[in-house]
Amino acid sequence: MLEFELREIDRFDRAICISTDEMAFFSNVTGKVKLYYLPHFVERGKLIEKKKDIDIVFVGSSNEHNQRGLIWFLEDVYPRLKEYNFSIAIIGEIVDKIDLAKYSNIISMRHVEKLEDIYSRTKIAISPLQSGTGLKIKIVEALSYGIPVVCTFKSIIGFPNKLENGCIIADEPKIFANAIIELIKDEKLYNEMQKQALRQYEMIFNANRAQESIRNIFQIESKIK
């Protein structure tokens, strides 16, 4: 796959990278190609006034990286959270691949009509990925709703800044569990992480900001007077 990407990218004068890590890599291995950074952007999430009855949410497809990450969470992190009786929601096609019935206080939904309904009820999101590359879109979505994220370092690959971005990074099960507990229990910390999440979204992933970047990349003059 890498050889294919390197061969194909050299056919073009310009290339767009949605990840700063990928941009840094390609800048070292390509010659003539002009590289631009354009992260995946989303519209600002609109929260609905609802009771926050979901403590933790994981949203994901059924790909092998999500499966591996969720299994790690369920086997190594979840047992450390059981005494707190947190409400956990697993959303997406991932629920077809993992038997969740044996876990108490976990609700699973293969499909939801509007993710905003789930995010409006959610306190924090998790991304326990153990493998994979590229920008994790579900983290971006959570940040757009001002939802703090507890994640592994693998999950944060592709973000231009790894600190003060609305995410707490933890690669060890005990540290991951403690980060979840502290974030849910400590209101002051939670409020600060919410602010970081929204600030990160506005600075990097806001759709309006992306439009200006696109104009610069394609050298399109803005028609906004």
List the model feature ranges, each with a label.
Residues M1-A15:
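Membrane-proximal helix-turn-helix segments that form the acceptor-binding/catalytic region
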Residues S120-G134, Y145-P148:
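Acidic donor-binding loop of glycosyltransferase active sites
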Residues C167-K174, E182-E187:
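Conserved acidic donor-binding segment of nucleotide-sugar-dependent glycosyltransferases
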Residues L2, N28, Y36-S108, V112-S120:
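Conserved catalytic-core segment of nucleotide-activated headgroup transferases in glycan assembly
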Residues K188-Q219:
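A charged, aromatic-enriched C-terminal amphipathic alpha-helix characteristic of glycosyltransferases
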Residues K97-I98, L115-E116, T133-K136, S155-P160:
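Short glycine/proline-enriched, acidic/aromatic patches that form the donor-sugar handling elements
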Residues K138-E141, P148-T152:
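Short hydrophobic beta-strand element within catalytic cores of glycosyltransferases
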Residues F153-I169:
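Short acidic/histidine- and often glycine-rich active-site loop of Leloir-type glycosyltransferases
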